[in-house]
Amino acid sequence: MLRIVLARSSRAMSSASPASASDSDTSVRKIGKALETYLKHSQQHVAMMEKHRAEFETGRRHLAKMMSLDIHELDQEAIDRAILYLFPSGLTDPNARPVMRPPDEILPKFQRFTFDEEGKPEGSRFFTLSPKIYGLLSDIGVKTHSVMKFYDEHVGSRSVNRSDLEPANLSGSQWVTADKLKKKLSEKFSKELYGQVIIAFEHLASLPGSAIEQKFLMEFREPMTASTGSKLFGPAIPEVHVCAVTNRRYAEVTTRCKDTRATVKVTDAGKGKFDIDGLQLHDFRHLQAREILLAPMIVSQSLGRFDVTATTSCISNTLPEAPNKAPLMRSGGMSALPRAVRHGTALCVAALQPEAIEPLRLSGLLTLDPRKNERSKVNQPGARAKWIWKRR
């Protein structure tokens, strides 16, 4: 009987050993392929960076000859001035203008890992596809556990402030987008991983006592007005302030339209009043002017919610005149003044009411009108009009 049991056990061991050996060989092959792929990408990145550095130095020497400068005097500031001089551009977006910078500042950085003497990576997340995003998830989990422990220890004590036992205040901000998080971590990841990160952040922010991790949470959030900065032409959406006397939110911005400059202040929790250079809304006799002033309120569906205070001035009156001429008194015009106030009102309403940013932008109320009156030409009745030509 003992011989039969020993025989069966030996057969089982002999049959299991090849399977375990094959599994270990497969895992070793996978690890070897991962290391081989990493080393291959690392060598390709080093060769590419050396090539681009050599091209940058060659272009730098040619630029120094073109500008008649010594190569040692051509620093980055001189290069920027030379590019601006050689390639004048009227593009309003700075990211669309030509630049000449070292490849280390422009090209994406390669993520490097450290290995020990045996060639094994020191970080355990090396074998994951996204080590940094998994590290961020681990940090969120650790901080979630610490917040829960902190709240359980100090929930009934008076040794800490009550504000520390409340959830984090994240009003006026939103989580960074997937593209910005990829740039921040210098790593690519899937949409599913980004969704898991946002869910983990939301859970951490909703916990009582998460105010102690306010700084960590705000590192991955951005103001709601920051996302529309590159989409707007003209002044950006202003910041929201709180009045120390009335404890009401307000926003203030300065803008222009043609020859009129307007400084607009919009206060929340108001009654829909307008005060433009001491004039009320009913003081504007033209129906067009009233419609222009009320346009931001109609689009944002906030009639009667905000109070608008504006002061206007004519830009031409502030310009120096010739010494032998008397100063000219100009006015901003009947339509330019309401349009300037409308633009400032729309920007302030977008700051105080973030959910109305997209409707205001699609309506064109957040875009500055850069047009100006064309000057009159000599010996012509107007800017473009010509005298009627007669043969005799």
Curated annotation (Swiss-Prot):
Pfam families: Ribosomal_S9. Residues 8-25 have a biased composition (Low complexity). One of its GO terms (biological process) is translation. GO terms for molecular function: RNA binding; structural constituent of ribosome. It is found in: Mitochondrion. Keywords: Mitochondrion, Ribonucleoprotein, Ribosomal protein, Transit peptide. Its main location: mitochondrion. One of its GO terms (cellular component) is mitochondrial small ribosomal subunit. Residues 8-27 are annotated as: Disordered. InterPro entries: Ribosomal_Su5_D2-typ_SF, Ribosomal_uS9, Ribsml_uS5_D2-typ_fold_subgr. Component of the mitochondrial ribosome small subunit (28S) which comprises a 12S rRNA and about 30 distinct proteins. Belongs to the universal ribosomal protein uS9 family. This is Small ribosomal subunit protein uS9m.
